[in-house]
Amino acid sequence: MALSEAAVKVQAALQERGLETPMLPNVFTPEERKDKIEFHMKEILTLMSLDLSDDSLADTPRRIAKMYVDEIFSGLDYENFPKITVIDNKMGFDEMVRVQDISLTSTCEHHLVTIDGTATIAYIPRKKIIGLSKINRIVRFFSQRPQVQERLTQQVLVALQTLLETKDVAVKMDAVHYCVKSRGVMDSTSSTTTTALGGIFKSNPATRAEFLNQSK
């Protein structure tokens, strides 16, 4: 299936800036990927001395394969990039548009455990206005990959800048990393905040402060 125009533009913009997720060319169909993941997951679980003949575990390798391809890593495939509705700003709206408390669930690319948090996004319209739900969908698309939070924040920023044809975009993410919470240091209370600011949000102290102060 051919990629949408929006997907092509966003992917090219990320590659140009060195912000694309490290990926190899995709040479397998989704079903082929599921079959290969299932095969290797059986080996992994067996090496961990789990009995896959037990009815509770028998379908686990296939469940994991489907979850990886269709759900938590579906953002690795630009065929899954959301359909984007962008309209001309005929009304001349030039004040901040802000969407906050966007839920995000991603996966740490170092240990493949959960990143759970929220995003706040703002932009100042110039030529284009985007459908509000599309902002949430873009966050979800880039979250559905193995990620580091810093890159995820930047990817969402560049995607919106590209689609809206303006630098005036701001992204803030607050998340709990289960690679910190459930293993290693096992800190159950800390969270991580990242920001990516573009255009007037970066250059104008008052606009930056307005965004960050309202994001608390």
UniProtKB/Swiss-Prot annotation:
Disulfide bond positions: none
Keyword DNA-binding: no
An example molecular function term from Gene Ontology annotations: GTP cyclohydrolase I activity
GO CC, any one term: cytoplasm
Keyword annotations from UniProtKB, A to Z: GTP-binding, Hydrolase, Metal-binding, Nucleotide-binding, One-carbon metabolism, Zinc
Catalytic activity: GTP + H2O = 7,8-dihydroneopterin 3'-triphosphate + formate + H(+)
Binding-site residues for Zn(2+), renumbered to this chain: C108, H111, C179
A Pfam family: GTP_cyclohydroI
EC number: 3.5.4.16
GO biological process, one term: tetrahydrobiopterin biosynthetic process
Gene3D superfamilies: 1.10.286.10, 3.30.1130.10
UniProt cross-references to SUPFAM superfamilies, sorted A to Z: Tetrahydrobiopterin biosynthesis enzymes-like (SSF55620)
Pathway per the UniProt entry: Cofactor biosynthesis; 7,8-dihydroneopterin triphosphate biosynthesis; 7,8-dihydroneopterin triphosphate from GTP: step 1/1
Similarity comment: Belongs to the GTP cyclohydrolase I family.
HAMAP family for the chain: FolE (MF_00223)
Summary of subunit composition and partner proteins: Toroid-shaped homodecamer, composed of two pentamers of five dimers.
Protein name: GTP cyclohydrolase 1
Lineage: Bacteria, Pseudomonadati, Pseudomonadota, Gammaproteobacteria, Alteromonadales
